[in-house]
Amino acid sequence: MTNGSLVQSLRSHLAWWGLKRFTSDEAYFQWQRETLSPVEIATLLREVEQKRRGSSADEVSFYDATAGSNILPVLHSQQYDYYLAIGPRVTDRIGKARSIQSILDVGCGAGILTTFYAREHPDRRFVGIDRSSASIARATKQAQALGLTNVQFECLDLEHMPPTHFSDLVLATHVLVQAEQDPGVPSRSWNTFERAGESELQADFERRTGIGARLDHLNALLSAQGRMIVFEKTRQLARRVPLQRALAARGLGLIEQPELIRYRLVEEIADDGPFYVLGRGASRQFHWDDSPEPDEGPPFDRAKLKSGLTDPDEPLYENHWPSAQHVWEQLRDKHFLKETTKQEPDGRQLHVELGQAEEGVYLYFANTLDQRQLVLVEPARMAMLESYYQEILDSISS
């Protein structure tokens, strides 16, 4: 099946589930008000807030409460483009690997994608597991309605999955790194993107996010030549590097080049991933990349600094991306006018400097969570950068 027909098949599947695609928040919430009763909307809002602030038990409660026939399609329509991004990619990998006969979908929820995979590959066996009993009940009911006999759903926590249940492919999408607010592992210092090889920082990340224990359990469920597809919210380098190190430490290697994926959540743009296809003892053709991804920072052309200006109030150059570090390193004859470096007890650093270079007066900001900023202006406008420098210092102290 071509990718176009696969996407169309998935659209039909999502429509069967009652999902709709929206690109406008206004249109989406209008549909929500038309579809759900005031009581259902109040329940949804209450559960969303409790999930945001609560524990693992609150998260299970959220999915139990929202697995109902009316709320589920409304809630999951927000993720319509996520399904379009992940569903065809996973389905394609299953189809191309004939050695994959048994597939385990961890954190399958109500089985929206799991049932799609089972429909597209009736000759393969699928098992979906989730901690939410209501989600599993809904998934089982929907699979029966679709007449699927090659998929089953079980209400299980990953930690309680019997180690005899081996699979040729384990799917883990948005399930391993559930601590969305965790900043990750800082770099060695503010002027590098490299992470130290210290096992203590890595172990602490794996422990506080729970990824270490989850990966250990997944690895135990993988057949000898099994594969794993992982897609998490680890786009930031400080989260991507420790995830990759956790995977590599458990003998998982890259089968193909990881893919960064962008999709919409109604009006919001989500940059997620990478999308990893992994295997035990994978070839050395692909290597883990611990460097920042290419960004949208403007190119630096010394010859065009002044000639390219169209607005006299604009800086000569401005970059708020990791690539700003490379430009800062290129500035000629730099010398500090002011500088401050703050170090936290946990080793994180923040550095800001106001300086003079051949190209002009600059302000440079960097920290160990890979944020970079560089602003360059003519010497006559140095007061603007001095004010900006002080604002940063005030924000640090507060």
Model features per residue range: what roles?
Residues 132:
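Conserved SAM/SAH-binding beta-strand->alpha-helix loop
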Residues 162-170:
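A short acidic, Gly/Pro-enriched loop at the edge of an enzyme's catalytic core
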Residues 198-203, 225-232:
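Conserved beta-strand signature within the Rossmann-like core of class I S-adenosyl-L-methionine
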Residues 173-213, 217:
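Mobile active-site "lid"/loop adjacent to the S-adenosyl-L-methionine
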Residues 110-122:
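Conserved SAM-binding loop of SAM-dependent methyltransferases across substrates and taxa
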Residues 139-140:
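Conserved SAM-binding loop
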